[in-house]
Amino acid sequence: MSVQPTPADHFTFGLWTVGWTGADPFGVATRKNLDPVEAVHKLAELGAYGITFHDNDLIPFDATEAEREKILGDFNQALKDTGLKVPMVTTNLFSHPVFKDGGFTSNDRSIRRFALAKVLHNIDLAAEMGAETFVMWGGREGSEYDGSKDLAAALDRMREGVDTAAGYIKDKGYNLRIALEPKPNEPRGDIFLPTVGHGLAFIEQLEHGDIVGLNPETGHEQMAGLNFTHGIAQALWAEKLFHIDLNGQRGIKYDQDLVFGHGDLTSAFFTVDLLENGFPNGGPKYTGPRHFDYKPSRTDGYDGVWDSAKANMSMYLLLKERALAFRADPEVQEAMKTSGVFELGETTLNAGESAADLMNDSASFAGFDAEAAAERNFAFIRLNQLAIEHLLGSR
């Protein structure tokens, strides 16, 4: 398999990723600002499918209407010239000091109203750009001090904000879905909707939850000590995996935003295995963009930035090649059968069987030989060894 990406691979990048200047809480920028038009042309040259952005990645917070129109005109022309798409747009409700206590959940009602209006205006822009997904990351929605929030009221306000945005999308007839992005902490000490599980539970409380799903990120789930592949699997199973952010993370620490696969490589392999091959017994498959949300090393100049963009795509394609070979290997298929992976796809109850029927089945309870069943060798290590051998290219 070629590791030369093409638009058919549907790789996308946030403007804030390749455009990150290297500024962090401990140091100033190490690179100059990147012209969004240059970003479009360079990503297209590298074989990407699309580019995404927060409103203020592209248009400064305090831009005049004339400045806004000029920026959008230049950006749209670059998109037209290159064929690059904008599959997703999101809103910055975290950088400006007005959002220091959040947007949708700020204790200041006037700020909440401003934040919601900002989102609604940005939904219009997303629709104009042809985006299909509108991501909401509540980076400042949370607290450091438990007594500072009425937590029930905060969740009410979050629901109000998301439902208002979703209702607006429906009223306008836009071909957009909302994807909530969970994260446990950073920049807030504790962020509302910190994990995939929290996000799924929240969506169930929405009036317009039918067009609201999730945008899980590799590092965000791993920051909470969770298994990213399990998280996206549950979102996919619930048919709520609307978008995905791929990057690298090494353990429970700050959000590293490494190149995809440059953190937990085994986890990255099984993530790609799920995205490309789907569930072993069938089920929903992810068909959206493979979106990279990472930070190029601040130690590098722009040559290094573009090398890092290429590295994300190359890592994915290499892992895709390994994952396809893994599933196609007859020895792996036999090992999966031995381990009971396919048996798990069989319903526990027989067709038409009730709980009462099961209780009356003596072979399943009184006559069940638990000691003999306990002797079964599931051979999970052998199956995993085959996966690692494929990952390392030794098979």
From Swiss-Prot:
Transmembrane segments: none annotated. Mg(2+) 1 binds at residues 181, 217, 245, 293. Its main location: cytoplasm. The keyword Metal-binding applies. Mg(2+) 2 binds at residues 217, 220, 255, 257. Its cofactor is Mg(2+). The active site is at residues 54, 57. GO terms for cellular component: cytoplasm. Keywords: Carbohydrate metabolism, Cytoplasm, Isomerase, Magnesium, Metal-binding, Xylose metabolism. Belongs to the xylose isomerase family. Homotetramer. This is Xylose isomerase. It comes from Arthrobacter sp. (strain NRRL B3728). The gene is xylA.
